[in-house]
């Protein structure tokens, strides 16, 4: 920074250029200091507008603290002075504008993890400096982070910051930006320095995802989501990124990671000492630099034209640094542009806190003018025309609405819908074969094929035999190298193919939501944490079941398969409480193993623990079955409503030798009477109780149970997990696809001869193990 004396102390010592922003009570201009010939930003606060507002103490406090701050990551206030009409703040000019606008207009994409780590490191350094002086910023957001000409991040807008007398001092004022405000602030609870850590977590999420974690169309709904900590981390982020976001966005402020720990987190260590080095077209002299040079000030309420995404502003005393915040935001600047990128208007709520009555002596601060009384509310200024930027904003909306897909660890599978056949093949490629009915050929044909690499970056569009298409085959069509193939990457995929990519990404997301990443056997249940890290399934040994997903929330089923709609009941509470413990434990297991992974050596999928063994006295086992039925006692039922067809009537352990004996005798009678191989399908078996069971070539099993035996359908996946579906229940598409073979199977079973030997065959009744099953069609839907 240039010495203090190099800056003029009257407005006549500056060459005031064009307007950068205009807001509630101040205007910001680009200017050139005639002494130093340095470009600066001048914020001119109109004294007439702030008279009687009662906010003068805030600004005096803000300026007093800001003028004492000096750090590379904090926007600099060079000097200030006043005359009869205005208070002037001479501020550092950040040439590349606010970070959020830079991401949307210049990069047109979220930041990479390495880029985000570089930004985060600078922000954390700045906050460590502020917190070391007991200064709480309270409004860290993407719009309050500015980029200098050399791409260094500057913390700006200290309009809500406050000076704490000690690090553990607490405040009660509700203030901040809704998308970044912490739960304790929204709830009007006491809050301190950890409130800034929550904002840092929201900032990191926004850097990596491109939108804030709690973003909605209305302020109130956003605040509701904040209070509930209702957010979802996309699965495409690395484990380290997800873990750091999770540690920053802890609802309990005492559980949040500290700033020092952020710098030592694996996410930061992995990124190393990287710096921001993105290419840019440079900020324009008018519009671009205004993003950098705005200052916050204090306003009451001003909504922009786009969304009800506002800024919460407290009337509490501001005791903090850098008054070089972005004026365009808080003054309603560039309202028409903000609606396209990061709608943040100014919205302030009066505070219950009182201000220190001590006033700052402007002359004591090196100024020869009377004390300033400033801050008020005024009309937002009209936007400055910027056609080039406006065009860039329009273009920014044109991008694929999903991040690059990733099929890492997903098993090959093939799945058919009405309009397409979706597959994940052995090399991880996603293949979408689009189907169209050809009336001339009287059949459906494959008319378009989209192949996407496992990392989602390469896309091949192919039209086989144009005009005719290909017949539908049992296996995914091979790649045809021809001049008609169109090869693209994720960044240059034409918009006409975006729907294909989104279709594939949703399919991969569905597969992830049904593919276990961590299988954990607790004392009460078998647990599956799915690959997307959000879907969770609990199959209690008692027969109860619990599922958890972002789309459907928590569903609880009792031992009879009936959904418990009242989750406040004692039974539901018990199941939910145990599931929460297991979910947290599975996440911890996953986190630990992620850290242990090196390169391509993956630890997943992983199974932890084993099913508890239930001892049964020999006297309770009927003669002749003691050696063949031990497994029935050691393996309780794992899924709600599932049926173990090796001993089909045993669903749970009960006391009493008579009851157990009768169950086992009934099971002994349910033996195979017919069996045959169906080409292209698998092995079909009819049991003596009327159950028809089809074991498919992928190891999965479909069992159709007659009404006399309880009715319904049981689907056993190739990994041994079974699910029972009652009659008239909605069936997953994978089950319906397998059931489509049933008429053919039943017809052949009618003609099949009876098995001559009635010997109980346990192997025929169980699904093949995953190890021996073929590689295809293992999707768990």
UniProtKB/Swiss-Prot annotation:
Q: What class of enzyme is it?
A: transferase
Q: Where is the POLO box domain?
A: 672-751
UniProt key word Cytoplasm: yes
**Where in the sequence does UniProt note compositional bias of the Polar residues kind?**
473-486
Write down the chemical reaction(s) this protein catalyses.
L-seryl-[protein] + ATP = O-phospho-L-seryl-[protein] + ADP + H(+); L-threonyl-[protein] + ATP = O-phospho-L-threonyl-[protein] + ADP + H(+)
Chain spans, region Disordered? 463-486
Question: What residues does ATP bind to?
Answer: 20-28, 43
Residue stretches making up the Protein kinase domain: 14-268
Annotated Cryptic POLO box 1 (CPB1) domain residues: 397-514
Instruction: Tell me what PTMs the record reports for this protein.
Output: Ubiquitinated by the SCF(Slimb) ubiquitin ligase complex; leading to its degradation by the proteasome during interphase and regulating centriole number and ensuring the block to centriole reduplication.
One GO MF term:
ATP binding
Stored Pfam families: Pkinase, Plk4_PB1, Plk4_PB2
Q: Subunit details for this protein? A: Homodimer.
Q: What is this protein called?
A: Serine/threonine-protein kinase PLK4
């Amino acid at each position: 920074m240039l010495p203090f004396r190099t800056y003029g102390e009257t407005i006549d010592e500056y060459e005031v250029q064009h307007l950068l922003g205009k807001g509630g009570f101040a205007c910001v201009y680009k200017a050139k200091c005639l002494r130093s010939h340095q470009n600066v930003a001048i914020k001119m606060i109109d004294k007439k507008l702030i008279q009687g507002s009662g906010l003068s103490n805030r600004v005096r406090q803000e300026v007093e603290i800001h003028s004492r701050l000096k750090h590379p990551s904090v926007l600099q206030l060079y000097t200030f002075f006043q005359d009869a009409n205005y208070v002037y703040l001479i501020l550092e000019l950040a040439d590349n504008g606010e970070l959020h606008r830079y991401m949307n207009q210049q990069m047109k994409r979220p930041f990479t993890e390495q880029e985000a780590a570089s930004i985060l490191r600078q922000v954390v350094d700045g906050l460590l400096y502020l917190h070391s002086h007991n200064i709480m910023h309270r409004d860290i957001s993407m719009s309050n982070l500015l980029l200098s000409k050399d791409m260094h991040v500057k913390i700006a807008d200290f309009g809500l910051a406050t000076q704490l007398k000690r690090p553990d001092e607490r405040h009660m004022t509700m203030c901040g930006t809704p998308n970044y405000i912490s739960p304790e602030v929204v709830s009007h609870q006491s809050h301190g320095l950890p409130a800034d850590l929550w904002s840092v977590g929201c900032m990191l999420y926004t850097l990596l995802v491109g939108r804030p974690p709690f973003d909605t169309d209305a302020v109130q709904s956003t605040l509701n989501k904040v209070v509930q900590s209702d957010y979802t981390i996309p699965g495409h982020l690395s484990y380290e990124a997800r873990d750091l976001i999770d540690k920053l966005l802890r609802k309990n402020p005492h559980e949040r990671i500290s700033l020092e720990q952020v710098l030592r987190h694996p996410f930061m260590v992995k990124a190393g000492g990287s710096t921001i080095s993105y290419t840019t077209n440079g900020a324009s002299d008018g519009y671009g630099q205004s993003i950098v040079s705005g200052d916050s000030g204090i306003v009451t309420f001003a909504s922009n034209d786009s969304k009800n995404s506002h800024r919460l502003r407290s009337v509490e005393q501001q005791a903090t640094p850098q008054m070089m915040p972005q004026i365009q935001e808080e003054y309603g600047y560039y309202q028409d542009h903000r609606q396209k990128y990061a709608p943040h208007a100014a919205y302030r709520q009066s505070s219950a806190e009182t201000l220190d009555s001590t006033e700052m002596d402007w002359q004591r601060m090196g100024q020869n003018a009377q004390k300033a009384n400033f801050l008020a509310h005024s009309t937002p200024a009209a936007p400055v025309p910027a056609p080039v930027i406006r065009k860039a904003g329009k273009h920014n909306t044109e991008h694929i609405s999903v991040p690059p897909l990733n099929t890492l660890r997903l098993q090959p599978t093939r799945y058919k819908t009405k309009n397409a056949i979706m597959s994940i093949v052995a090399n991880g490629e996603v293949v979408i074969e689009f189907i169209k009915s050809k009336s001339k050929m009287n059949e459906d044909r494959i008319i378009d094929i989209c192949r996407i690499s496992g990392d989602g970056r390469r896309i091949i569009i192919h039209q086989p035999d144009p005009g005719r298409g290909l017949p539908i085959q049992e296996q995914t069509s091979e790649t045809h190298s021809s001049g008609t193939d169109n090869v693209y990457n994720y960044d240059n995929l034409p918009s006409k193919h975006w729907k294909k990519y989104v279709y594939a990404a949703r399919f991969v997301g569905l597969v992830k939501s049904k593919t276990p990443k961590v299988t954990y056997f607790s004392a009460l249940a078998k647990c599956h944490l799915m690959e997307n890290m959000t879907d969770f399934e609990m199959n209690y040994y008692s027969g109860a079941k619990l599922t958890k997903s972002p789309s459907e929330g928590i569903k609880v089923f009792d031992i009879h398969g009936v959904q418990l709609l009242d989750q406040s009941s004692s039974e539901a509470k018990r199941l939910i409480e145990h599931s929460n413990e297991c979910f947290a434990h599975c996440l911890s297991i996953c986190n630990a193993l992620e850290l242990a992974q090196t390169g391509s050596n993956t630890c997943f999928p992983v199974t932890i623990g084993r099913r508890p063994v239930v001892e049964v006295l020999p006297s309770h086992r009927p003669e002749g079955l003691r050696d063949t039925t031990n497994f029935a006692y050691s393996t309780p039922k794992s899924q709600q409503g599932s049926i173990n067809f090796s001993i089909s009537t045993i669903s749970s352990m009960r006391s009493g030798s008579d009851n157990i004996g009768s169950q086992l005798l009934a099971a002994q009678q349910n033996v195979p009477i017919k069996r045959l191989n169906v080409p292209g399908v698998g092995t079909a078996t009819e049991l003596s109780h009327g159950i028809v069971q089809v074991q498919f070539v992928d190891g999965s099993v479909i069992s159709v149970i007659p009404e006399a035996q309880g009715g319904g359908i049981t689907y056993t996946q190739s990994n041994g997990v079974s699910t029972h579906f009652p009659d008239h229940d909605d069936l997953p598409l994978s089950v319906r696809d397998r059931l489509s073979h049933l008429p053919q199977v039943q017809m052949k079973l009618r003609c099949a001869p009876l098995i001559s030997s009635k010997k109980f065959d346990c192997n025929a009744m169980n699904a093949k193990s995953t190890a021996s099953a073929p590689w295809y069609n293992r999707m768990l839907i």
